Amino acid sequence: FGANDNMTRAQVCQMFYNLLLDKDVAITVNFADVSDGAWYAKAVNTLASLGIVKGIGDGMFAPDRAISRAEFAAIASRFAKASNVGSVSFADVFADDWFYDPVLTAVSYGWISGYEDGTFKPNANITRAEVTSITNRMLARAADTNFLAGNVAALKQFSDVPVTHWAYGVVMEAVNGHDHSKTDGVESWNGLTR
């Protein structure tokens, strides 16, 4: 799965593109470093045309560059069309930072949190496991731990995400298609769909 690998800008675009309900979007933005044949081209250009992602300047996107926690918070907030609903204080996030509002938005919605030392680490790269965890929270998805425990052999597994990994349930939720029902916001899996 690459749980501890840094998430790239292209990967984030593809993930959010896959979540779009309406993919029929007029492409109004293209980047010089995103070739038409690239696996992520449609995702990048669509999300850029919707104003969800932005380039790095000079008509470039830097698709292979690792994405920071601040960048991801900004993209997630724009994707969800969410705005800041609270106030949170971090030692390294200031009102004049470009990412101030998106970080506070993501935190106020409970999608992402800071660290015990009172920092957010906005410029730190974000991992695939962290992105999966945040995205599941955005979508109000959570794995049914009882189902997971009773069906380990049937689940799509990854050697770098053992049952003891902090993101095991998060990853299982994201990669294993399943039928489910919800009661009081708690997801109960009824079976795998593959």
What positions do the PLM features span?
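Feature responds to low-complexity, polar/acidic, surface-exposed segments characteristic
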Residues: 1-13, 17-42, 49-70, 78-102, ...
